[in-house]
Amino acid sequence: MNRIIRTLLIFFLFNISTFSQTYIGATGGLMSSSLSGDAPEDASYSGKTGFSGGLIADFTLTEDIVLSIQPRYLQKGTSVAYDVGEYELRDSLTATFDYVSLPVMVKITSLNKRIYFSSGLDFGYLMNSTVENIVDGSTKDVNELIKNYDISATFGFGVNIPIGSPIISLELRYMQSLLNLSDISTSESGSTFPFRFRTSGFQFLTSIIFPI
């Protein structure tokens, strides 16, 4: 996965001059994510808010089609609520997954490039994963239970706001893992994570890009 990410970055950095218009800038925002799939016994998953931030490079392919490369840091996670015999489930654990992420997106622009629809793949490499016990505040490393790579499908809608030469973009994006993230070879029965699960969630992103 690291080799794929490096190859894509090198390819686009050395081929910037072949595109009709190139923009570079910064992007950041929030992600509300959770796990989908099997849940531990007597438990359910709920959403957790994380952060993302990184760089963005937009390459204009045609008048209405833009290729966007966005290397970044991305934080995913979930809360795990257990049935403790009360009317409502009680949050007991919080899981956090820190990724180096490389979304490769295609944007289709409309209305004089003021709005766009985006779709693509997000290649992620897991840097760290932890579970925090909300009750006693203890934290446990769970890297051995999670695969160190992920590929997600992404779909989004955005608005471009020109402010002279720079452009500010606001985007709402949905992200869904395509792979089972559980490391079955080392998972243990009765652990926090089951044998099959994926991450999914919504991101709200703000970007500013400059023509070069």
Q: What are the roles of these predicted feature ranges?
A:
Residues 1-27, 202, 206-212:
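Bacterial Sec-dependent N-terminal signal peptides
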Residues 22, 30, 58-132, 161-166, ...:
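Gram-negative (and chloroplast) outer-membrane scaffold detector with strong preference
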Residues 52-56, 116, 152-154:
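A broad helix-preferring feature
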Residues 79, 145-155, 159-212:
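Predominantly the C-terminal beta-signal and adjacent terminal strand-loop region
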Residues 35-45, 76-98, 127-149, 180-197:
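Flexible, solvent-exposed loop segments that connect beta-strands
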